[in-house]
């Protein structure tokens, strides 16, 4: 069982540990997700933990495996068998100097030291990424072209040739868009519109070279629109 908590700058002890809630005119203690995970022996997933403020330090004793004392109700909660804590972070708690992950913060070093191991997740291999896309799209050749395109862009990014990357998530967005419009050019274009014009054009030009069946130089035909009947 996994209990997932999406962390933001506003996340505090009340959100995590719990607090009193007004129920039918009375104040009633309500466990937060951390206590629920502790008592059920579940996996606690702290998602995007580097978005947190220093209020996240209320988890110190829990990360040490000692449980937590709920001072507001005078109860100590020990972790049930199987309880564990995982956290995800784009910056490993070091913040984002280049602004790519704006909103992330530098986390307390003592807090970070309480996580014994860190796993770095790189992009999937080409074969794995193809399998992911093939689950969502029947056009296997299109999936292969997309994966090759994304792989080239990432290599160019790491070499300093471009300032953005195409993530696996972005490729998934494209095949989902393709399932809607049945048009490769449109699916790719609407999914790279989020990038600045220069980067977008560079990505489209590169895909032109990867897939001979696609041409972004021409106009994409407009979608037929239903005729509206205006009442007289």
Region locations from a protein language model:
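C-terminal regulatory/interaction module of P-loop NTP-utilizing enzymes
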Residues: 1-232
């Amino acid at each position: 069982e996994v209990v997932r908590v999406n962390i933001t700058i506003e996340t505090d002890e009340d959100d995590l540990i719990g607090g009193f809630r007004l129920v039918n005119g009375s104040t009633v203690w309500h466990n937060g997700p951390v206590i629920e995970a502790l008592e059920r022996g579940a996996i606690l997933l702290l998602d995007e933990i580097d978005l947190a403020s220093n209020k996240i330090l209320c988890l110190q004793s829990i990360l040490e495996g000692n449980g937590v004392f709920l001072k507001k109700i005078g109860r100590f909660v020990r972790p049930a068998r199987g309880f564990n804590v995982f956290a995800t972070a784009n910056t490993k708690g070091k913040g984002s100097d280049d602004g790519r992950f704006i909103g992330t913060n530098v986390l307390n070093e003592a807090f970070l030291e309480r996580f014994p191991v860190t796993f770095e997740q790189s992009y999937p291999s080409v074969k794995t990424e193809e399998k992911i896309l093939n689950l969502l799209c029947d056009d296997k050749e299109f999936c292969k072209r997309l994966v090759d395109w994304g792989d080239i862009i990432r290599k160019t990014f790491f070499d300093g040739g471009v300032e953005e990357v195409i993530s696996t998530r972005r490729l998934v967005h494209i095949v989902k868009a393709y399932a809607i419009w049945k048009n490769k050019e449109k699916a790719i274009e609407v999914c790279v519109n989020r990038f600045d014009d220069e980067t977008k054009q560079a990505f489209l030009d590169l895909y032109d070279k990867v897939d001979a069946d696609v041409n972004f130089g021409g106009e994409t035909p407009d979608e037929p629109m239903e005729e509206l009947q205006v009442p007289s």
